[in-house]
Amino acid sequence: MDLYPESILNLIKSLSTLPGIGRRTAERLALHILHAPLHEAQTLANDILELKQKVTLCRTCFSLSDQPECRICSNPRRDASIICVVEKPTDIVAIEKSGAFSGLYHVLGGALSPMDGIGPDELRIRELFSRACSKTTTEVIIATGTNVEGEATAAYISDQLRKKGVNVTRIASGVPMGGDFQYVDQVTMQRAMEGRRGF
């Protein structure tokens, strides 16, 4: 039997629908919000509403943006001749944190997965081909995941773009920094050996 008032139960139920939030965590969050100053709760509510109302997809790269073009696509300092293809907007965040890339991005919106009914038409591959075949593009870097779906997506895009004469590369993968060889799987080790470079 729940002893909380209905409004608290409703918030617990809503919070527990979020990824990684179970009932106990949702309960703690709901009680925290209840005891927080009213302006903090109002700010949180307003931020959620603003997120839902303003955030959309960039018209160029399909990343998240609150403007027609995202900050990266609208930045004249970015190298517009290189496009890095990723599966989702969070992949951009990871790459940007590295500081190793200064080009533009293209978010596919997922990866090919025939078992789940996701083919090329369900992703933003057509839009990628249009961008990649422009005269200003010198390289397309494929940075999809290294799982089966990511590899299949990379192979499909690479094959199609090479037929169109586009220079295509794939991000390297291999042994992580500080990784112990005894814990590295065979595929990762194989890729690390194949992707070796001068030192």
Curated annotation (Swiss-Prot):
Domain Toprim: 81-176
GO biological process, alphabetically ordered: DNA recombination; DNA repair
One Gene Ontology molecular-function label: DNA binding
Pfam families: RecR_C (PF21175), RecR_HhH (PF21176), RecR_ZnF (PF02132), Toprim_4 (PF13662)
Keyword terms: DNA damage, DNA recombination, DNA repair, Metal-binding, Zinc, Zinc-finger
Top-level division of the source organism's lineage: Bacteria
InterPro entries: DNA_Rcmb_RecR, Rcmb_RecR, Rcmb_RecR_Znf, TOPRIM_dom, TOPRIM_RecR
Zinc finger extent (C4-type): 58-73
Function: May play a role in DNA repair. It seems to be involved in an RecBC-independent recombinational process of DNA repair. It may act with RecF and RecO.
HAMAP family attached to this UniProt entry: RecR
Annotated family: Belongs to the RecR family.
Protein known as: Recombination protein RecR
Native source species: Desulforapulum autotrophicum (strain ATCC 43914 / DSM 3382 / VKM B-1955 / HRM2)
Classification of source organism: Bacteria, Pseudomonadati, Thermodesulfobacteriota, Desulfobacteria, Desulfobacterales
